[in-house]
Amino acid sequence: MIHGFLKACTVSPALRVADCAFNTQQTIAAMQRAAADGVQLAVFPELGLTGYTCGDLFFQQSLQRAAAKGLAAVLEASAALDLMALVGLPVAVDGKLYNCAAVVCHGKLLGLVPKTYLPNYGEFYEKRQFNPAPAGVRTLHFAGQEVPFGTKLLFRCAEMPEFCLAAEVCEDLWAPLPPSTHHALAGATVIANLSASDETIGKADYRRALVSQQSARLLCTYLYADAGHGESTTDMVFAAHDLICENGSLLAESRPFGPGYACTELDLGRMVSERCRSTTFQPESEDYQTVMFHLPLREVELTRYVSPAPFVPADDNARAERCELILAMQADGLAKRIAHAHAKTAVIGISGGLDSSLALLVAVHAMKQLGRPTQDVLAVTMPCFGTTHRTRSNAEILCEELGVTFQEIPITRTVHSHFADIGQGEAVLDVTYENCQARVRTLELMDLANRTGGLVVGTGDLSELALGWATYNGDHMSMYGVNADVPKTLVRHIVRYEADATENEALRAVLLDILDTPVSPELLPANENGEIAQQTESLVGPYELHDFYLYYVLRFGFGPAKIYRLARRALGDRYPDDVLLHWLKNFYRRFFAQQFKRSCLPDGPKIGSVTLSPRGDWRMPSDACAAVWQAELDQLG
C-alpha cells in the first residue's frame, strides 16, 4: 500500500450448488491463500456462498440461514487476516430477498450492498426470486452485527485514503447507467463486481471490453469476479472469467475456463492523479455513507508490467500506427502554419542527426499535403568545429533523396569573428564556445527565412526541452517547432518507421545510418579519428531513463520515490540502482533549473498527453524551488 500500490485479486473457487458449508470452506481457504500471498483485497463471485444457480431453492429458509451461517464463519476467519473480502449471498430483509455483496474486513461486516438491476430475459429469471435494491441506506442486524444495507456505500481505508471501494453486482455493469458510475463520482477509486455471467459465444470479448471501458470512463480500478466451476450446468456454463482493469488497461485476467484467479497490484495513486486533472470528473456524494476500515500499510512487491518505454507502444503494429499518426499530426500543424503565414519556404537547419532529420521528413510531408514541391523546403547545413564527415555526408544525402533544396553555409569564420568581438579565447572549450555556434546557426536560419520569405522550422524534441539541453535563443528558438512534443525515444521509432516504409533504398540506408549515429550537438571538436567526441547521453544521461522519468513526473505527478521504484521494476535489468538514482537526481536538477527556456517556447503541435508547452499543459514558474523534491531524493540515497 506504500506509494499507492495495493495487491488485489479476484477469485472463483469451485463450489457445490446449495452446499453452503463446502462453499464457505472454499471461500475461507482462498482468503487465507490470498492473505499469505500479500493480497489485501479479494473479490469473490455473485452468490458464491450458495451458488448462483440455486433457482427456487433461494426461497428455502434453510438455505438462507445456511448462507448467513457461512458468512459468520467467513467473518470469524477474516479476523486474523489483513485482508478485505467481498463475498456474495442472499439476504432476506423485511420479507424480501436481495442478492447482496457482503464487505468483510478483520472480522467486521462493513456493509451489505444489494444488486440494483435484475436480469429477467433469456436464460435469466432473477426477478422471480430477488428484489431490486431499495433506495437509501439503512441499518440491519445480520450475522450477529449491526450493518449498513444499501447501494450508496463507500468503504475507505484509514491508512490509505486513496483506497475507496464500492460494489455492484453483475448485471449492474450491463445497465445503461451502472451504479458504479455514481460510486465513482462519490469518490470510489476501486469498483468490485461480484458476478455470475454465463458463457456464450463472443461474450468473453464483450465482457472484457465492458470492464475495460468502465474503468476508463470512471478513472478507476475495476475488479470483476465471475462464477465458475461447480455451478449447475442444467442450462448454462460458467467460465470463471476474472478481470482486473485500471483506467482502460487490462492488468490481469483469468482466461475463460481457466484457474479462476487473477492477481495484480493496483496503482491507486495513479487514479487519484487522473481525477485531479480531469475537470469533467465532478464529485457527487449526496446520500452516500462512508464506512472506514483499517489495513496495515505494507510495501507490495511489484509484479505488474511497467513499460521501460512508456511513450512507445510495445506492439509492432500499434507502434507503426502511432508513428504514422504522429507524422500526420506534425505535418498537418506545419502545413497550416505555412499556409497561414504565406511562407514561400520552410527553412530547417539540418545536422545529420535524428531531430533535424525528423523535422525535415515532416516538412516534406507538409509540402506534399499543401500540393507544393519539396524544393520549397530549404535545408541548411552549417558545419563548424565539431561537424564530422559522417553527419555532414548524411545531411547532404538525406536532402538529395528527399528532393529538397540544400545549402551549405560554413560558420567557422563567423564564429571566430564573434569570438573576437566578445573576447572569447578560441582554445577555451566552455559553454560560451558551444553556445556561440548554436546562436550563429539560428541567426543564419532566421535571416535566410527573411530573405526567402519563409519560416524557420524548429527541430528540438520534448526530451531536450525537459532537460534544457538547448541553447537559449539558439536551437531553442524557431518560428514553429514540430518536434517539441515528441520524446527522443519516440523520435527514433518515427525515423525508423520512415526508413521501413520507403521504397527508396538510398533514403532507407541514410536514415538507418542516422539512427546508428551517436546523439550529439557536435559543438566540440571531433576526436583524432574525426569521429564525434561530444556524446549527449554520456553528459546528461540515457534518454530512455529521462523519458521514463519525464513521463511519470508530468503525466501523473508522482514523486521521486515512486518513480525510482517504478524505474527499478521497468529498467532494473539494464541499469543498477545507483545509476537509476544518479540520473533521476540529474533529471530533477535540470528540470527545475531549465524551466526559463520552456517559458518562452515557439508554437508547435500537441502530440501526446505529456507536453511542456507554456500555453497548454505545463505552466510552471521559472524560479520555482526544488527543495521538496530534493529532500525526497536525498532520502533515497
Language-model region placement:
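Enzyme catalytic cores with a strong preference for nitrogen-chemistry domains
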Residues: 1-347, 365-374, 401, 406
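ATP/NTP-dependent adenylation/nucleotidyl-transfer catalytic domains that generate, transfer
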Residues: 6-7, 23, 161-163, 220, ...
